[in-house]
Amino acid sequence: MLSRLGALLQEAVGAREPSIDLLQAFVEHWKGITHYYIESTDENTPAKKTDIPWRLKQMLDILVYEEKQQASSGEAGPCLEYLLQHKILETLCTLGKAEYPPGMRQQVFQFFSKVLSQVQHPLLHYLSVHRPVQKLLRLGGTVPGSLTEKEEVQFTSVLCSKIQQDPELLAYILEGKKIIGKKKTARESTAPPKDIAGYRDKDCPHSDALNRDPGLDKEHCGVPALSIHLPAETEGPENGPGESNLITSLLGLCKSKKSRLALKAQENILLLVSVASPAAATYLTQSTSCCMAIAEHLCQLYRSMPACLDPADIATLEGISWRLPSAPSDETAFPGKEALAAFLGWFDYCDHLITEAHTVVADALAKAVAEKLFVETLQPQLLHVSEQSILTSTALLTALLRQLRSPALLQEAMTFLLGTDQHPAAIEDSPHTLGTHLIMHCDHLSDEISIATLRLFEELLQKPHEQAIRSLVLQNLEGRLYVARGSPEPESYEDTLDLEEDPYFTDGFLDSGLQPSTKPPPAPATSSDGKTAVTEIVNSFLCLVPEEAKTSAFLEENGYDTYVHDAYGLFQECSSRVAHWGWPLGPAPLDSHEPERPFFEGRFLQVLFDRIARILDQPYSLNLQVTSVLSRLALFPHPHIHEYLLDPYISLAPGCRSLFSVLVRVIGDLMQRIQRVPQFSGKLLLVRKQLMGQVPGEHLDHQTLLQGVVVLEEFCKELAAIAFVKFPPHGPYLNFSPPPEGQV
């Protein structure tokens, strides 16, 4: 009974309520806004204290309500047609530019954003919409910290979302009137009849909706004098396209001091470059300065950093994310910390853009970053005569490589560092490439530069790209010219020399009275399972250092078990990284009829071997880095690398050296030096304890030599462990089960 009574009352009220003319209400609100400018004399009242925000809200609500009422027809309603035909958005854009009343620009940004997001009818194809959108974009993103930053970000977010849904809009928003002539025919063939009027430059076009009240039409046509006499800069872009206004606006917003707004702007650019349409992606790269602008901002951040940065300080910020680019507050402050964090964060962002972008955009952006940052900015610093410039730029490049993930940018980095020449290097070649200069820096007079450059190459070798290992090592090992012709293949070790018969090995023992820790027997033939051979090879490395020079046993920490388990994990990781490179399972067969040619290990291995040969005379930190790079190389599961670096029984061609033969010479030198150092064993044990932090680090005589001996012992154990997990050489991809603790 009550429900029936309520229904009757509602029906009675509805009968008395007059029907609302949406168009009339819409025009009345617009007239209210325009009359404010005619009648108001107060220039200081903020826009939010006038009735303008309320009237704009009513106009928006009318547009949304009208669209819901006409959802079945799919055509633009009278109010929307009125908005388009009378260039209301153009007029609002002009009012926003004038910033009168104060805060009007903020209201205009909000209205544009809400209309474009809440009205479902496609709008950005219309000239009377995308032209004011372009003009409004020019008003924002130019001054960091402006009062409208929040509204600008919301506005650009709506535009990027629309482009993501319809990539064809990209040309309208970025180029505008220039594109109209090219697309007019296609547009008119698909647009509804009532919509076509929206493209025409008429202030008062004829419309059935307006014909309901001729007085209303005439009255309105006299109202918007504001829109008839617009300033020249608000007219269509007659002098050329609006050059990437959305992009420049977004890049400006990325510089906002408000991290949330900057992050949202970066996410909007990410939406823009990941458009699915190949045509839109091509347009974005060829008809705009998008890629170059992003790369140029990266270079600006680089130039804003101090010229001199400590590599240790750079290392504290490695791995910084673009989503959290601010420097960690708990780290020690240093000059340029915030600038460095901003640079590394933007580089990570560029790398992420290239990863997520359409292939066309990714390639173009990668080339832009390579050209602007690598070639034009970093390369002069890397080749500079100033040691500080070399040191800082090398450390920064290492940090960039560590963050780099995108395949396209990785390819550009490889080409930048190593070039494209895949021919084996000759000893007489002049150092004409950047890569060759960097290799020479590994043997620089400055130990700091040598360490920093070795770290760079170690990072390079860990990237999932074959060009690094091929250019640095493999191309010089092809053909196995390091093996003496007529020598047996590596599967048979019967005729090889044992260590005491090696001419390199005996040099160090002449009249020394010292002997190696154990005498390895002549290498027997490899058994079917390879266990005999691996035992001999492992023992060859473990027995290199004489007992007088070993100290790890005195500290009850042999360390070999730990090396094996570490090597196993690193080898599995390396094997999975190179599995798809199609490497052979065994070494290339020797051609006995091929004339002998001189072998050159390549500049990279040459420098590393020269460095390891001076291990007893180099600083401890430098020795650690040299051995780290060599261990990283030895892990690669290529049969030629395995043979050249880890096979003690290889029969070397005349004049050639291998890693093992270099170590043998070092041991020979060590045995002669031991006799000249009083209380050698006691001092060596003390130095090891100092390095482990067990005793205070007081300075000792022959400290460099003693530290070098400790590194040498550990390096030999590490090589033995790597050989163990990699063997046999003819099947480096075999998956061995990890050895149990304590049973190695």
From Swiss-Prot:
Chain intervals for the UniProt region annotation (Disordered): 184-213, 510-530
Pfam families: DUF5917, KELAA, RAI16-like
Superkingdom assignment: Eukaryota
Tissue: Expressed in colon.
Deletion consequences: Mutants are viable, fertile with no apparent defects. Mice are more susceptibility to colitis induced by dextran sodium sulfate (DSS) than wild type littermates. They display significantly increased tumor burden compared with WT mice assessed in colitis-associated colorectal cancer model induced by azoxymethane (AOM)-DSS.
Biased composition (Basic and acidic residues): 197-213
Disulfide feature: none
Coiled-coil spans in chain: none
Family membership: Belongs to the FHIP family.
Function: Able to activate MAPK/ERK and TGFB signaling pathways. May regulate the activity of genes involved in intestinal barrier function and immunoprotective inflammation. May play a role in cell proliferation.
Entry-linked PANTHER family: FHF COMPLEX SUBUNIT HOOK-INTERACTING PROTEIN 2B, RAI16 PROTEIN-RELATED
Protein name (record): FHF complex subunit HOOK-interacting protein 2B
Organism name: Mus musculus
Gene: Fhip2b
